[in-house]
């Protein structure tokens, strides 16, 4: 049984959570909401992946810095010019906007990392396999492609090194080895897609309604979570409609305050994102109490 309590919830609950977390995470550019999203995504990612997840979380920090620093080179708009480079102004507003865009990218990568661990292919097919079988199969293949691609790439590089290939230290040797690996991985991905499609077609996939590999039943706890999430999403959407998440960067920085009535929207957003983490610690505390009574 999965140790993460949220992973044991009904797939509809899990899909609604990630739909809200990723959907609002993409469109909201307010720094406070972005920071809350990063904390929640990183925390849940570490709970799912254990100590090994720190490597992935830290790996995104150089990406964040690089995207932040590069944005003003392509977007010189803004009032506060920090310095000029190549005859173009390097503005503070563009730097701040680059940080927000980079933050959104990193947060989305973390949420998708959590999604791939929680929403397995059988859960997704259970939800949408009978409604849109072709689209469901395509989305499952896409979501599985990235982690499988990196895993297969590491295996291929390790296999090549074990036979003495790809160990050159020169620039030309490294480029040649990289192109060889890329060519092999491209062929592997295309071949895998064709084989999967042919295999599913030969099994009659999509020709009629199908049963799920695993039976997922809606419990009272699932219904309670659905009601809570819908209520929190309604509060967040209402705050966004009233302008409580407004953020302007050009020509000058301007953010909606997290105070007054807008504070309730921010609290609802944080509560929504922390649902899986709260469930995890709630179960851990419950088991700790039970074990202490033995």
Model segments located where?
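N-terminal transmembrane hairpin
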Residues: 1-126, 207-294
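Structured inter-helical modules in multipass membrane proteins
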Residues: 108-217
């Amino acid at each position: 049984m999965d140790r993460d309590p949220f992973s044991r919830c009904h797939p509809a609950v899990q899909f609604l959570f990630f739909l809200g977390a990723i959907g609002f995470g993409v469109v909201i550019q307010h720094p406070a909401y972005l920071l809350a999203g990063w904390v929640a995504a990183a925390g849940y990612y570490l709970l799912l992946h254990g100590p090994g997840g720190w490597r992935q979380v830290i790996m995104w920090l150089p990406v964040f810095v690089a995207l932040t620093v590069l944005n003003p080179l392509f977007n010189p708009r803004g009032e506060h010019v920090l310095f000029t480079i190549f005859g173009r102004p390097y503005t503070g507003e563009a730097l701040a906007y680059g940080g927000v865009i980079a933050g959104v990218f990193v947060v989305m990568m973390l949420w998708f990392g959590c999604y791939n661990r929680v929403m397995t292919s059988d859960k997704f097919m259970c939800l949408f396999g009978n409604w849109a079988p072709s689209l469901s199969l395509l989305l499952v293949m896409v979501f599985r492609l990235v982690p499988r691609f990196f895993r297969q790439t590491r295996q291929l590089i390790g296999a090549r090194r074990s036979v003495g290939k790809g160990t050159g230290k020169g620039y030309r040797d490294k480029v040649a080895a990289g192109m060889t690996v890329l060519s092999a991985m491209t062929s592997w991905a295309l071949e895998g897609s064709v084989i999967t499609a042919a295999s599913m077609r030969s099994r009659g996939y999509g020709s009629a309604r199908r049963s799920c590999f695993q039976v997922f039943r809606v419990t009272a706890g699932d219904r309670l979570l659905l009601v809570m999430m819908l209520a929190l999403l309604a509060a967040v959407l209402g705050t966004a409609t009233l302008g409580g998440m407004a953020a302007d960067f050009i020509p000058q920085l301007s953010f909606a305050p997290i105070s007054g009535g807008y504070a309730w929207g921010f609290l609802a957003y944080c509560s929504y994102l922390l649902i899986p983490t709260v469930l995890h610690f709630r179960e851990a505390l419950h088991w700790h109490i039970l074990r202490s009574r033995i």
